[in-house]
Structure formats: structure tokens, C-alpha cells
Amino acid sequence: MDAEIKTIDGGFCNSYLIGINGENILVDYGRHDKMQKALNGADISRVLLTHAHRENCADLWLFDREIVAFGDEYGILSDISGYWKKYGLVYESLGTPYVRPPIRQPSKVSKGENCSIAPLAAIGAPGHSPSHTVYLLDSGGVRYAFTGGLIYQGGKLPNLYDCEWDYGYMNGLFETVKSLRLLTACKPDILLPDRSGPILGGTGELAKFADRLDDFAHFLLRDYMASGNETQSFDSKSIDSGFLTKPAGVEGVDEISPNLLRVHKNYSNLYIVICEDHTAFLVDCWANGYSGSGNLPPFSEMMETLAKRYGIIKYRCVLLSHYHGDHLLNYDEMRKNFGAELWVYENMADVVENPFCYKFPATLPYYDRGENSGMSFFETKMPHTAVDRVLSDGEIFAIANHEIKAFHLPGQTDMGCGFYMELDGLRLAFTGDNIYYSPNEAVSGHDCFAVNNRALPEKEGYLKCARVLKELGPDRLMCGHSHIIDKPMPQILRLERFALDLIEKLREFSPETEYEWYADPFWATPEGQIIAKGERGCFVRVKLRNNSESPARFQGCICLPEGFRCFENGFDATLQAGGRLTLAFYVRAEKPVPPGIYPVTADIRRDGVDFGELFDHVICVEGAGFKSGYGL
């Protein structure tokens, strides 16, 4: 029997109404009021979900019908509160989740593997989500594929952040490629995505898109992986020792010049600059802070040994290259045992002090894993990190006899700072994690490109990094995770070429005219907060970013789980090109709620386009048995 297929504009997603064998089936479910109006009383037997991201199922708690989901999507949707309790611990990349489920429990969720959905067939197609599912239907001699977020019209990818399953290894994209090729073998004629028009010539379009996306994923790989020689980029002893450095007589420490030391182990460097007055300062501060960091001596013991060997009477401060916790792990020891201050760039100061407010990967609490791996980040036992001095772009400051320039140096992340100084006759730039030494002229040596780092290439990422370094023209780059790069200009130019190519590829795959929206998971995002024990409420900030070259209008509201209320939670703001705006909303528990983790989302329209509850964060309610160890 032939099916009748109707496309319903569900607001934040397409929903498809299939009438067949006397039964009405929906694929995905949009905004409830629009859906009910479009359905006009039709008797729906079940809803088949392609994935569990909110824009396809956020309002299903209002719809009393059987909901069918497969694999991990079922696991998430069948226990929403269980997912949120483990926020940042499951389906995450260095602590940043890559699934975006609803904040309220949908009704009647059934496990797809236990259901008969004939005459449709379900095909597992992970990538856009862990168990993304495509549904096939043969009708009237045509094979339809309901493809969810797998591919959009014009050979576009819905976004990058949902595919960011790891930190630079591109497994989410490679899984998407596998799914595209699997679906190609099913030979569909027409593809019906969840947020674009239909795609005709489905089999051919899938094959072309799979090849393009495979090339893109390989292009995005961190360059030490793409070159196929990880050791060459990471093994600090293999090239530097005897060439640019000599052993300092302490395990894991090299002397680069009379007044510059490097501690290196397990792919990470910290630098010690010695001053004329026998004091010293550090650039970054980790050497052996967590399990797996190698066999260096205990950190404080090592620093004391170096102080005696080099006549250092005081460690003044630590200059931080970027916010990632692996560059900060031993700072608490530096403060407690040596009195060293922490100096950071202005756009990372709050992230360092209040990491739980942000959905960035690799914040310091992430590294409190080991024996505490089952703990919420809010329960970390790591001490609070206080910033002593905030540096601005272009600021020149002195530490004893050394003059140092701090400058915004994004790349791997927007929240990066470079430090430039002349030392022992050389002009040095300390560059953090933005670039790796690469003798291979075919690659740039770029580090990870992760959109969750906030790293749009032109102003927040690798293009700005390359152009700042090109203008600076240092003799050497002192890198966070690789060899020293001597005479670095050829490699800086290769990094610039990579960044320009990256922008073109982002434009190629973006379903929006301005690629920045596609690669920015922070353009309308709430921030996490804590409701302290004995309190009933807190202020939740929502940050808006206009990535357009023209004004953009943002309309929306805060969405909360049951038991919470936000007074005057709506907003309507127009931002000029490149504008930024932070809004604050007071959220209150209507009655005492159990201690734990609770989600908060922002329901967003931009220039009249309905995006739904796109981005999220969490509120931590402290109480008996649950207290944040990393408080404000």
C-alpha cells in the first residue's frame, strides 16, 4: 500500500506525517503548538525519533503518544534526570557534552529495538548523535529516507559541535562518513532531513557528500596526526637535546639558555625564566599533576631542586598561556609552597576562577578525574584558583630586569595569551598550544580545531594567531606541547595558509551564509551557576553573540525543569554587527528541591528563525551530601 507523506513545519524542525495501513506515524516532533495545529486532530499512533537533540523532541513531554528511539538515544530519553546528573561525565569531550537532550522527561519512550515499525525500516547512522537513526520507507516505487541531521540540502552539515565527540581526532565526523556510505548502499531516492528541504537523487548526493566530508575530517585532524609521525612532534628529547637545549641535571628539565629552563614530560612543557635578582617566573604550570604524567619527581621537590641549582630565591608568578587545566594543574603547589601569583589574560580570568560557569572543554575540574571519575565537576576536590593580575592585549610589564609583552594569541582557543620577550640575545614568543613543530612542509603544525574551545578562525582562532606571529617575527616559538620552533616564519606562513583553507571549508559545509553560526556553539548560551545550601535562587547569565556583518535580532526565553521559575524570563534584543550582550535572569526554586544538577536552556529565535532550545548549561543546587568543592 502506498503511503501519504506530509511535511509539517514544526518550527525548530521538520516533522513528517506518514499515513499508511490506516495508521498515522510521525518522524520527529517540533514545537507543540505548531504541531497540534498542523495535525488538526489526526490520531497519531507513535513518534519515531531520528535523534535525541532537543530541537527534534523538546516538547514531547506534552504529547501523550508512544515515542520510539534506538540505542543511546533511547538510553538518554528514557532517563532524562539520570543524564543531567552525569552532565559532563558521559557523551563528552574533555568535559564538554556533545548531546543536547530535552530538559523534561518525554512520555512513553519505547526502545526501538523492541518495536515493530513496519513498513518502515530503521538504519543506525551515528555521527550527528551517538545513535542517530535513519528511517527507510518504500512507497509508489520510490525509496524515501528520513535522514534527520545526517545531511542537509546542498550537501551541508547541520553543525560541527554535535559531531565533536573527542578532542581533535574527528571520530564524530568519521562516524558520519561511515553512516553516509551505509545509507548510500541502501539506495534511497529522496532524502527528507529534519531542517532543510528534500534532497532528490538521494543515493548520488549521499555518495558525494560522504567523500567531501571524509576529506574535511582528514583536513581537520591535528597536524601531528595528519603527518603520521606523532613521535616527531612530541618527543622533546629527540631533536631539542643537544641542538637547542642541554640537560639541566634534573630529570625532565632542559636548559635552553643560561636564563631559560624547560620542564617537559608527557608532551607538555612549562618554562622557567630566571631574573638578575635571583627570582624567577613560570610560563604555564604543570609537569606531573595527574595520573599518567610520567615519572618526574614530585613537583614541589623538583622546583626546590631547581631553585638550589640555579640560585633562585623566589618564584614570583605564573603567566598562563590559556585556560586549559593541563597548563594549571600544579599551580596550587606554586601558590602554597612558593607564594607565586597567577597572572592571566583578561578574557580567560573568569573561566579560570569560575570554570563551572562555562561549557568549555578541558577546564581545570576536568583533570580531577582519576579516583574521582564518577564525580560531577561541581563536586571536584580541586581548590579554587584565584587570579592575582589580569593582563590586557598589548600590555608591556616588567618582572625584575625582564620586559614582557602580553598579547591576545588565539588559535586552539580564543582564550589564549602570548608572551614576547628578549632573553639571552633571542626574541622569544611563548605560544601555548597553538602550533607544533613540524619538519614536514606539507603540514602547518596546527593543534586541535574544536569549536567548543570558542575558536572562530578569523578573530578567535588560527588565522589571527598566524598573522599576529607573522607581524611579531620572533626568533623562536616556545610551544606548549612540542619542540622549540627555531626560525619559525616558514611554519607561521603554513599556519596562515591552513587557517585560510579552514575558513573556505567551513563556508563550504555551513548551511548558513555566514559560517560562524555553524561553528559557534556559544552564540546564545546560558552559563552554569550554583544555588548555595540554604538559598533558593541564583542569577543565570545568557550570553548573546552576533556573528553577522549586519544587525541581528535575538528573541527568546529561559527554560527550566519542573520546580524552578524565572520571573520576566523573556528577552528581545537587537545586536549590531559583531555585538555581544550578557543578560541576567533570577532563577528560583518554587519549593525546596533535592540537591543535585538541574538543566537550564535558552529557547531562541534569531532574525525570525526558530532554533528552539539550542544550547544548555546546568544549575548546581547544594545541600546535604552534595556540595560544590569549587565554589564562587
Predicted stretch roles:
Residues 24, 114, 119-208, 212-216, ...:
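Metallo-beta-lactamase
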Residues 1-39, 134-152, 252-308, 418-437:
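Conserved beta-strand hairpin/beta-sheet module of binuclear metal-dependent hydrolase folds
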Residues 160-161, 165-269, 277, 463-555, ...:
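Accessory terminal helices/loops
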Residues 592-628:
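Terminal connector regions
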Residues 550-563, 603-604:
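Short acidic, flexible loop segments centered on an aromatic residue
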Residues 31-115, 289-291, 297-396:
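Active-site HxH/HxHxD metal-binding segment of metal-dependent hydrolases
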Residues 573-581:
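Short proline/glycine- and polar residue-rich coil/turn motifs
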Residues 574, 588-594:
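Short, surface-exposed loop/turn segments at beta-strand-coil junctions that are enriched for proline
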